[in-house]
Amino acid sequence: MSSSMNVATMQALTFSRRLLPSVASRYLSSSSVTVTGYSGRSSAYAPSFRSIKCVSVSPEASIVSDTKKLADASKSTNLIPIYRCIFSDQLTPVLAYRCLVKEDDREAPSFLFESVEPGSQMSSVGRYSVVGAQPAMEIVAKENKVIVMDHNNETMTEEFVEDPMEIPRKISEKWNPDPQLVQDLPDAFCGGWVGFFSYDTVRYVEKRKLPFSKAPEDDRNLPDMHLGLYDDVVVFDHVEKKAYVIHWIRLDGSLPYEKAYSNGMQHLENLVAKLHDIEPPKLAAGNVNLQTRQFGPSLDNSNVTCEEYKEAVVKAKEHILAGDIFQIVLSQRFERRTFADPFEVYRALRVVNPSPYMGYLQARGCILVASSPEILTKVKQNKIVNRPLAGTSKRGKNEVEDKRLEKELLENEKQCAEHIMLVDLGRNDVGKVTKYGSVKVEKLMNIERYSHVMHISSTVTGELQDGLTCWDVLRAALPVGTVSGAPKVKAMELIDELEPTRRGPYSGGFGGVSFTGDMDIALSLRTIVFPTACQYNTMYSYKDANKRREWVAYLQAGAGVVADSDPQDEHCECQNKAAGLARAIDLAESAFVKK
């Protein structure tokens, strides 16, 4: 849902992700049409969800139906994508995710990524959404202990390493996809690693100055890194109204390519069948009966008191005045209990706070529900992109007020100075892994509008050095200056002293590293963390004996502290950011729980 929608239209609006116009029309007309574009294969699905399939919109044969092309490719590559293209007018990303992951299977690694592109005037729905489930492999790291689960070979190994990020890197180095075959796929993430990197993964890089032994208390015991290797993904193209159902065949020599192709085709058929389920899963409609652009009530349950946070700000200012640092981001973690399911909260969040990086990620130990506005780092065809967002103002009630607040934001010396400082820090991070002279500031101090706030944004780019990979870029970027400070390492040392608990996923990153070597990692801001290991003896029943579990939701937010910061203002900024995110929980509870 576009953030530009008039607030008045949000009242009593039914969630529409359950029923598209094309599906609703089935109830109004008895006629239906089945389109089959895959030669030699008939469709035999129930009329409640008729199969609408095509290999390609164009008449040209795809790799799926061209075995000669596959045989030729197998001589020079060990990764081959096969896909089926289906019309998406009966299928939404939310429904596709629920087709692949059952409602009660909250421990199953899986993801749903969506996007709303920001603009100076309004936002628009991003072109692609991506869904994935059942990874072929998983890597889970806790400090220096790493567990690797190879689900295809049914093996599990455990080891202690200095840098767990080296494990997926070494596996990725063996990939050799055929560039011509990849060109047939949509310009989006189409398979590879997906997961999250916690803030504390910086300790793998800065072992001496930021050791785990000096880290704050780890009171949640969440993984520091979780990655799944997804051979199967579904990519929705919202412009062309179709979905690519993709499976990657990995040719490791254990099978002849003919057998690997046959197995891959059967796997693809099974994946398509899940999306054309005879009895599609039901998604509760829900009613949007809240003012979605309002902030929720302030959250009082924090890992620090108001006085403790303000005292930390005062100590940080002392270090700034002493010349130790220029700026630091101090955060606090709020806690809230809810009977709304995390997936229901995600459905609400995509209405309340649409952002460029919308994500629902089920990982080991936790579920992330995210609406991040900011890239942590992006690598595409050896071009590195860093987009600092710093400097924030609330949105106005109308266009005139928006313009006034935008002007005030760009004239605010404190906000602009902080932004320029972080742009310089971003240039430094990008410069560590780029070719000499290639770093550019392509955009400087533009305004981007989101549902509740507007930000000052800049874009820093550079060309990746020869011999380096996206994993080197990630190591150089984690964590970005907008969530740590400047100078970065010294600011993080002070964060260890001033914050009482480890940050975990907050201010780390989540996203994907594709089979092609591209990377798109979002900064874990505006991200709700639901630990899956937490159990409470507070189960109760609603009418119809529909049992619900009580979840604990963690909402963490920070404020940038500089020399002239006011401790009370910084505390209020943290509260306001968290309250805006908590609005999604309010909406989920009113729409799905309090019926």
UniProtKB/Swiss-Prot annotation:
What is the tissue localization of expression for this protein? Expressed in the central cylinder of mature primary root zones, including pericycle and early lateral root primordia, and vasculature of cotyledons.
Q: What class of enzyme is it?
A: lyase
- Residue range of the transit peptide in the UniProt record, numbered on this chain: 1-54
Question: Which GO molecular function annotation, any one, does this entry have?
Answer: metal ion binding
Q: Which domain of life is it from?
A: Eukaryota
The compartments listed are:
Plastid, Chloroplast
Description of how activity is regulated: Feedback inhibition by tryptophan.
Binding of L-tryptophan, residues: 115, 356-358
Cite a single GO BP annotation: regulation of auxin biosynthetic process
Which pathway does the record list? Amino-acid biosynthesis; L-tryptophan biosynthesis; L-tryptophan from chorismate: step 1/5
Q: What is the effect of changing residue 341 to N?
A: In trp5-1; insensitive to feedback inhibition by tryptophan and resistance to the herbicide 6-methylanthranilate
Query: Which metal ions or organic cofactors does this protein require, according to UniProt?
Result: Mg(2+)
EC assignment: the record states: 4.1.3.27
Entry's Gene Ontology cellular component terms? chloroplast
Catalyzed reactions: chorismate + L-glutamine = anthranilate + pyruvate + L-glutamate + H(+)
Q: What happens when the gene is disrupted?
A: No visible phenotype under normal growth conditions, but mutant plants are insensitive to inhibition of root elongation by ethylene, resistant to the herbicide and anthranilate analog 6-methylanthranilate, resistant to growth inhibition by the tryptophan analog alpha-methyltryptophan and insensitive to feedback inhibition by tryptophan.
Question: Per the annotation, which location comes first and is thus the protein's main one?
Answer: plastid
Q: What induces it?
A: By ethylene, methyl jasmonate (MeJa), wounding and infection by a virulent strain of P.syringae pv maculicola.
The residues that the entry says bind Mg(2+) are: 418, 573
Q: Which residues are reported to carry the modification N-acetylvaline?
A: 55
Family (UniProt): Belongs to the anthranilate synthase component I family.
What is this protein's function per UniProt?
Answer: Part of a heterotetrameric complex that catalyzes the two-step biosynthesis of anthranilate, an intermediate in the biosynthesis of L-tryptophan. In the first step, the glutamine-binding beta subunit of anthranilate synthase (AS) provides the glutamine amidotransferase activity which generates ammonia as a substrate that, along with chorismate, is used in the second step, catalyzed by the large alpha subunit of AS to produce anthranilate. Plays an important regulatory role in auxin production via the tryptophan-dependent biosynthetic pathway.
Q: How does it assemble?
A: Heterotetramer consisting of two non-identical subunits: a beta subunit and a large alpha subunit.
Q: What is this protein called?
A: Anthranilate synthase alpha subunit 1, chloroplastic
